[in-house]
Amino acid sequence: MEFNFASRLDSFEEGIFATLNYKKNELVKAGRKVYNMSVGTPDFKPAQHIMDAVSEAASKPENYKYALADLPELLDAVSNHYAERYGVKGIRHEEIMSIYGSQEGMAHIAMAICDPGDVVLVPNPGYPVFTAGPFLCGAKVETYDLHPENNFLIEFDKIPEEQARRAKMMIVSYPLNPVCVTAPDSFYEELITFAKKYNIIILHDNAYSDIIYGGRVGKSFLSFRGARDVGVEFYSLSKSYNYTGARMSFVVGNQAVIDKFKNVRSQIDYGIFL
């Protein structure tokens, strides 16, 4: 029997990291030494207190039920972390939601924001899901190019006026994967001004702010005045705590965006484990 599948998949092959993992395993089987420069999976173990807490929580039968809402203690911990780590004070529970890793969040949030044909601006180069998520939701993905001559920062004056006016959502990420650059304070201020001018929702992927070297400081988009008015930030435990396989992240920021995203996710899952 011959099936007809969704045409939206015609533009996609298997995810690049799955493909590279297969090739890596084949080389390892052949006795080759492989340095894995593909998906960013830390090869360090999580801190002992983290593993102990997970082990203890996994031994409690009540933790195997549906987690229909985030625990207040969890939301408090996220809010307190943002205050202590980034100086972002006063984040309310309504401005936080847990997700199955930032990859999942980025893949689904366009369902809450974009109608088919809406324009989403994504960086080039950029992480694959920045493009895949909006595209699979029917949005029109348009790239903005990042150049080494400008330290891979967005050149807002190079984004055409007509494109900016059509854009509904814009994905930004600093420190940026795969080019490992950070952004100065003036950049974030310009980003917020740009978003307000064109009424664009900003999604900031903040997965790498705790693994920065050379005297640089990882910052949160939300620490800048007006950020919560224009968007949300994805904060991941994967790289900061060597917690990649457990799939634990948060989306933090604008309550209206998070409320709509909660609505979407309530249709498709029942919360994170532990």
Locations of regions flagged by a protein language model:
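N-terminal small-domain helix-loop-helix segment of the aminotransferase-like
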Residues: 2-3, 8-101, 108
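Helix C-cap/helix->beta junction micro-motif
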Residues: 27-30, 137, 197-198
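A short helix->loop->beta-strand "cap" motif at the edges of active sites that frequently abuts
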Residues: 118, 139, 194-201, 227-229
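Short acidic capping loops at alpha-helix termini that bridge into adjacent secondary structure
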Residues: 90-96, 116-119, 166, 228-231
